[in-house]
Amino acid sequence: LLAIRERLIPLLREQQVHYRQHLRPKLLEHKVELLDYKQLNDDQRQWVDDTFQTSVFPVLTPLAVDPAHPFPFVSNLSLNVAAVVVDPETGQRQFARVKVPQKNLPRFIAIPSNLSGQEHKPVHTAIALEQVIAFNLKELFPGMTIEGHYFFRVTRDADLELRDLEADDLMLALEQGLRKRRMGGEVVRLEVPNEMPQDVVEMLMTGLNVEEEDLYVIDGPLGLDDLLSLTALPLPKLKAQSHGGQTPTVLARSQQHLLDEGAIKPDEFRSIFSVIRRQDILLHHPYDLFSTTVEEFINQAADDPQVMGIKMTLYRTSKDSPIIAALIRAAENGKQVMALVELKARFDEDNNIQWARHLEQSGVHVVYGVLGLKTHTKIVLVAVSYTHLTLPTRRF
């Protein structure tokens, strides 16, 4: 971690310089404006404050730190507001933490462009959610004076310590490990802005049990990776042209949907298996479409009455995986289906556990990989019976 820190600090500085000097000005040239709260005009400020009351305030939970309330748990990669409030009657200072609810709300809140008051107004105006919260802290701490607010972000160790050889039930062991990870691994990075007072920094370091080498002082906004959400804006001129991919010519007449739609005649259709029996096919993804090659192969295997069984390894799968849907359909069609599901896919463990259970409930025989190793490879084996053609069973 110390070696990483040495390389990371200059990169973080460069990142903030690029954000201030290049990205924000370039976005503004294309009428995309990211405003700080203090830059808002009266109409924009009123709109933001109203939005806070209606949409943000109800999901906030401020947590104070005092002898009766220990330092709250801070989840991995969460963005937080550290508030220092003062009781005007006693003069007592108190620290409180407010978590920025990014799972419920977008990191950047769009402000109606007609409120800009400019003749050539930006088309897209937004403000960071944490700024909306920070400048409305008085609503969370009525009767208190807000001495200051500061943002901070925590990164926790996400490694799962699993001893495969000692686990009677790998899935159960993994679920227990995931619960421990959610409860929080050791803090390996604390990010704070350079304007945060030293006493607040020390309070955070003590409360989070952070060493000096795990403290990163950032000269700018935290969590700049959330800027990725701006790519959803309808600005086609700023987007690289997407590559559509193609269907290999050799499989052009092997698409079941074309047969179903009448785009090709039954005597023109060639199943993928009949094509592969004659020649090997080398695919280049993403230039060759996955949907009309591998996905079509699995779908035809699931529905072909000559297919006896399917065996496949699964590492990372989407939440609406068509491959898994095809495997389930194959099992329901009476085929012998076996899936090796690698449960230990980093940050996809929950997803893989749910899919493994769903596959088992559908009649698929599921195994969980090789003890002590992680299975990354993507392999599928399909056994097809050709007894009606007096040919031996083939494996594809």
Describe the function of each predicted region.
Residues Y37, V86, P101, T155, ...:
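Generic beta-strand/beta-sheet core signal
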Residues I379:
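Active-site PLP attachment segment
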Residues P10, E14, V56-V59, V74, ...:
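Primarily the HKD phosphodiesterase
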